A protein has these predicted regions:
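Short amphipathic alpha-helical surface micro-motifs
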Residues: 33-37, 86-89, 132-135
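Regulatory cytosolic signal-relay segments
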Residues: 1-48
């Protein structure tokens, strides 16, 4: 969710909102074949959808600061992040991509088994990309990711 900074926080309203959500009918949730449009998602409704998520990050990235300075680290992170995003973004079933630090995650709309199989192929492409990137990093005497 993108921040819009258009409202101030009110603790009393927040408490009421929590009560509204927790006391809502269990019938306020419906099954959907695909992920609903963002405009259809509110804090007052809910959907059951079949999705698959991929999370990929740089293991031990905090230790990389011991070996490399900022320009090198920035290049390593950018190469990793940009290619992860590119691979996921190439898939029509990928509906959401987020970057959190050195983690990239994508949410894929997977109503059918064949869609899940496709996400496994995406994971395989990500793995192959990491192997290529590590080869390139070794050639520059950088740490592998």
């Amino acid at each position: 969710m993108e921040s819009n900074n258009t409202m101030s926080y009110d603790g009393d309203k927040s408490s009421d909102s929590m009560d509204d959500i927790l006391n809502a009918s269990d019938n306020d949730y419906c099954d959907k074949d695909s992920i609903p449009a963002r405009s259809d998602l509110t804090f007052k409704n809910g959907y059951y959808v079949n999705v698959t998520a991929i999370f990929i990050d740089i293991v031990g990235s905090s230790d990389m600061t011991d070996e490399h300075k900022r320009p090198t680290l920035a290049k390593m992170y950018r190469a990793f992040l940009s290619e992860c995003v590119a691979i996921m973004n190439a898939e029509i079933d990928c509906k959401e991509i987020n970057i959190n630090g050195d983690c990239v995650w994508g949410v894929f709309d997977t109503p059918y088994k064949s869609d899940i199989d496709n996400v496994i192929s995406v994971a395989a492409r990500l793995n192959s990309m990491i192997k290529i990137l590590n080869y390139k990093l070794r050639k520059k005497n950088y740490s592998e990711i």
